[in-house]
Swiss-Prot record:
<feature type="transmembrane region" description="Helical">
    <location>
        <begin position="126"/>
        <end position="146"/>
    </location>
</feature>
<keyword id="KW-1133">Transmembrane helix</keyword>
<dbReference type="GO" id="GO:0005506">
    <property type="term" value="F:iron ion binding"/>
</dbReference>
<dbReference type="GO" id="GO:0008610">
    <property type="term" value="P:lipid biosynthetic process"/>
</dbReference>
<feature type="transmembrane region" description="Helical">
    <location>
        <begin position="19"/>
        <end position="39"/>
    </location>
</feature>
<protein>
    <recommendedName>
        <fullName>Protein CER1-like 1</fullName>
    </recommendedName>
</protein>
<dbReference type="GO" id="GO:0016020">
    <property type="term" value="C:membrane"/>
</dbReference>
<dbReference type="InterPro" id="IPR021940">
    <property type="entry name" value="CER1-like_C"/>
</dbReference>
<feature type="transmembrane region" description="Helical">
    <location>
        <begin position="328"/>
        <end position="348"/>
    </location>
</feature>
<feature type="transmembrane region" description="Helical">
    <location>
        <begin position="186"/>
        <end position="206"/>
    </location>
</feature>
<feature type="transmembrane region" description="Helical">
    <location>
        <begin position="48"/>
        <end position="68"/>
    </location>
</feature>
<keyword id="KW-0812">Transmembrane</keyword>
<comment type="similarity">
    <text>Belongs to the sterol desaturase family.</text>
</comment>
<dbReference type="InterPro" id="IPR050307">
    <property type="entry name" value="Sterol_Desaturase_Related"/>
</dbReference>
<dbReference type="Pfam" id="PF12076">
    <property type="entry name" value="CER1-like_C"/>
</dbReference>
<dbReference type="InterPro" id="IPR006694">
    <property type="entry name" value="Fatty_acid_hydroxylase"/>
</dbReference>
<dbReference type="Pfam" id="PF04116">
    <property type="entry name" value="FA_hydroxylase"/>
</dbReference>
Length: 627
């Protein structure tokens, strides 16, 4: 928000939240009904295309969001290398308000404005007139209006809201107070209203003009340079007719230069072109892909997780992954969800790609996505292809000089690759160190269990983490109750020889601390006493069936305050909370440990040292749950 918010700062429908799209629903239904029921001579395709344009604008902007976030995480041609935090994401989450506003006005114009209904598909004279009006009056008026917005009175009340984002994302371009958008809409309406009054407006010219505005806005704020030098060498006047991302980026860092809308000619005419324009452009083109110190390899979970990942919807990725997806994803977007899921996992070459970049002290940490869902990992027939992708990612990272790769979620399954041991045995000369994160996860779980607990129930699949936790607890004198004979036998074989109790009696459901993981059944949860604390040791959280019980987070810690560029949530974890498996790789690199930390067994003797190292680097335990 602006430093001193003026009148008409907030959008009128702000209280509606995500239900704001209901404002256009009656108009959409009415236009569809009239088109279907009207006779051929009275059908108005132009009115029907308004909703198509609205949907296209949202998809178009989302494409820019995803591409920009991936490119800036990768680092190639990046312009401003500063962090984006949750504060900016929250401020920009209403970027689609202007789409709703424009849609409502277009419906009104279609009904009331002469020449704005029953439009032909295409008219060349109308398109030429609109192009000339944009290059002339629109660009000229915008330039001077923009300069006026930088006067202290208007800047402090309105435009400072937009300039709160020093590092821009595509959607930053449309994050303005409501009053500013009224002015911008009047400006951009000049070509369309004039063509309409002249009777030469067409469907293609409207859609093309608005798409041009959105494209240029998004491109100018994408924070990576994409114009090749040869383009300006082939056509030198282009420098005055089309701005570049680096050109507008200077406006956000210098404030008093580069005011033009899309055509820099007005800055050249009035002497407000920044002196660094050419040098920043050339320097941005020379920036190569960044080589990180640590790579964390993860994957998608559910189909709807494509929206919650960092390259998805910013408003969703900045919040923990939901147990129940939002109503609009389930009801309206499932075809798009399936299409995107198919494209990610089948239609494009399968390889990992970077989607997030964090800074922690002197470390650069990249998160890479393996484009597979959780259900792929549970199918034996997908194991070979998944291992091939992981293997290629390890070798590529090793070649680039990456220090550590941590295997997140199901990439470190024992059934898949022996918790990473398979790659170490196959490539014994690897310089990169593989960390499956199990040691860090185990020590986090151990320290999450209340100190006063003397007896706990163990229930879930017996994994490497679970075995290490049970062993350590038994060594500390905590009685661990196991409910299945098979799990009891495996734990005995692994070296647990005291404080381990096997019982199938209902009386042994009474301890108020349960150590749980994948495999716990809903019926078993219901047998726990009121007030029981469930402590997960697995990647995935248990179903929260009991409102009278407490559920801890999956193994995780809060990141140091010095950690930068954290603008999204890691799956179901909260803001600035990181999974233990990812922390394991980071701590391994910070400590400079030379050995791999992966394989079928966990070195229990090192757990305390790993915990102390995490605390030493300012990772903080999550607040304890009551017992």
């Amino acid at each position: 928000m602006a430093s001193r918010p003026g009148a008409l700062t907030e959008w009128p429908w702000s209280p509606l939240g995500s239900f704001k799209y209901l404002l256009v629903a009656p108009l959409v239904m009415a236009s569809m009904h009239s088109y279907v029921t009207a006779v051929d001579e009275e059908k108005d395709l132009s009115r029907l295309m308004i909703v198509v344009l609205m949907l296209w604008r949202i998809v178009h902007s989302q494409i820019w969001i995803s591409v920009s976030r991936q490119r800036t995480a990768k680092g190639t041609n990046k312009i401003v290398d500063k962090p984006i935090e949750f504060e900016q994401v929250d401020r920009e989450r209403t970027w689609d308000d202007q789409v709703i506003f424009n849609t409502l006005l277009m419906y009104l114009a279609n009904i009331k404005l002469p020449g704005a209904s029953h439009l032909p598909p295409w008219r060349l004279d109308g398109a030429i007139l609109m192009a000339l009006l944009h290059a002339g009056p629109v660009e000229f008026l915008y330039y001077w209006f923009h300069r006026a917005l930088h006067h202290h009175f208007l800047y402090s009340r309105y435009h400072s809201h937009h300039h709160s984002s020093i590092v821009t994302e595509p959607i930053t371009s449309v994050v303005h107070p409501f009053a500013e958008h009224i002015a911008y809409t009047l400006l951009f309406a000049i070509p369309m209203v004039t063509a309409s009054l002249c009777g030469i407006l067409s469907i293609v010219s409207i859609m093309g003009y608005i798409t041009y505005i959105d494209f240029m806005n998004n491109m100018g704020h994408c924070n990576f340079e994409l114009f090749p030098k040869r383009l300006f060498h082939l056509f030198p006047p282009l420098k005055f007719l089309c701005y570049t991302p680096s050109f507008h980026s200077l406006h956000h860092t210098q404030f008093r230069t580069n005011y033009s809308l899309f055509m820099p000619i007005y800055d050249f005419i009035y002497g407000t072109t920044d002196n660094l324009t050419d040098s920043l452009y050339e320097r941005s083109l020379e920036i190569e892909e960044e080589s990180p110190d640590v790579i964390h390899l993860t994957h998608l979970t559910t189909h709807n997780s494509i929206y919650q990942m960092r390259l998805g919807f910013p408003s969703l990725s900045s919040c923990p992954l939901w147990s129940r997806p939002p109503w609009y994803l389930t009801c309206f977007m499932w075809p798009f969800t399936l299409l995107c899921s198919f494209a990610l996992t089948s239609a494009i070459p399968l390889r990992t790609f970077v989607f997030e970049r964090n800074r922690l002290r002197d470390l650069t940490v990249h998160s890479h996505l393996l484009p597979k869902f959780s259900f792929h990992y549970k199918s034996q027939r997908h194991h070979e292809s998944i291992n091939t992708i992981i293997e290629e990612a390890i070798l590529e990272a090793d070649e680039k000089g990456v220090k550590v790769m941590s295997l997140g979620l199901m990439n470190n399954r024992e059934e898949l690759n022996g918790s990473g041991e398979m790659y170490v045995q196959k490539y014994p000369k690897l310089k990169i160190r593989l960390v499956d994160g199990s040691s860090m996860a185990a020590t986090v779980v151990i320290n999450n269990i209340p100190k006063e607990a003397t007896e706990i129930v163990f229930r879930g699949n017996l994994t490497k983490v679970a075995s290490a936790v049970v062993f350590a607890l038994c060594q500390k004198g905590v009685k661990v109750v196991v409910l299945r004979e098979e799990e009891h036998s495996k734990l005995i074989k692994s070296g647990v020889d005291k404080n381990l109790v096997l019982s199938t009696s209902n009386s042994y459901y009474s301890p108020k601390v349960w150590l749980v993981g994948d495999g716990i059944e809903n019926e078993e949860q219901m047998k726990a006493k009121e007030g029981t604390l469930f402590v997960p040791f697995s990647h995935f959280p248990p179903n929260k069936l009991r409102k009278d019980c407490f559920y801890q987070s999956t193994p995780a810690m809060r990141v140091p305050k010095s950690a930068q560029n954290i603008d999204s949530c890691e799956n179901w974890l909260g803001r600035r909370v990181m999974s233990a498996w990812k922390i394991g790789g980071i701590v391994h690199a910070l400590e400079g440990w030379e050995e791999h930390d992966c394989g079928n067994t966990c070195n229990v003797l090192r757990l305390h040292a790993i915990w102390e190292a995490a605390l030493r680097h300012d990772f903080q335990p999550l607040p304890p749950s009551p017992l």
